[in-house]
Curated annotation (Swiss-Prot):
This is Macro domain-containing protein XCC3184. PANTHER family: GANGLIOSIDE INDUCED DIFFERENTIATION ASSOCIATED PROTEIN 2-RELATED, MACRO DOMAIN-CONTAINING PROTEIN. It comes from Xanthomonas campestris pv. campestris (strain ATCC 33913 / DSM 3586 / NCPPB 528 / LMG 568 / P 25). SUPFAM superfamilies: Macro domain-like. InterPro entries: Macro_dom, Macro_dom-like. GO terms for molecular function: O-acetyl-ADP-ribose deacetylase activity.
Amino acid sequence: MRIEVWQGDITQLDVDVIVNAANESLLGGGGVDGAIHRAAGPRLLEACEALPEVRPGVRCPTGEIRITDGFDLKARHIFHTVGPVWRDGKHNEPEQLANCYWQSLKLAEQMMLHSIAFPAISCGIYGYPLYQAARIAVTETRDWQRSHKVPKHIVLVAYNEATYKAYHQALATQETAAA
């Protein structure tokens, strides 16, 4: 079992599932969400539109997961999750972000998926501080692997050098604390 930090385009990874940092409508947007929609092709939008709304305009509330096929991606599945919008860290943002990772891992285990790739959820337009988000991503994935066998391979995908460094710093900090 391993956690890997990888810098590049999440849509190019050959994994069982990629996690999409989506918005509540699941109809595509900017950042990684837009990149995934473009790479997966028009059938992804059709699949997302077919998902039921839980309230007007909302197909996936913050912290929850919705599943679609990967369509034109190498990944067989896409887990769409909505991370929190950063306000000040005092409105359950850390718990909501942690839940995005934990629920994705739980669903991957239930589906017996062996590899999963995460973007830096909430770190784009949602404004989550990068180092705090990286620490949560590393904590949740490490904690998961301590008590579960699947998925065996977790990839934390950095879209730029700053994110790559933040993930590595979070991993190093946890390794030092564990020693």
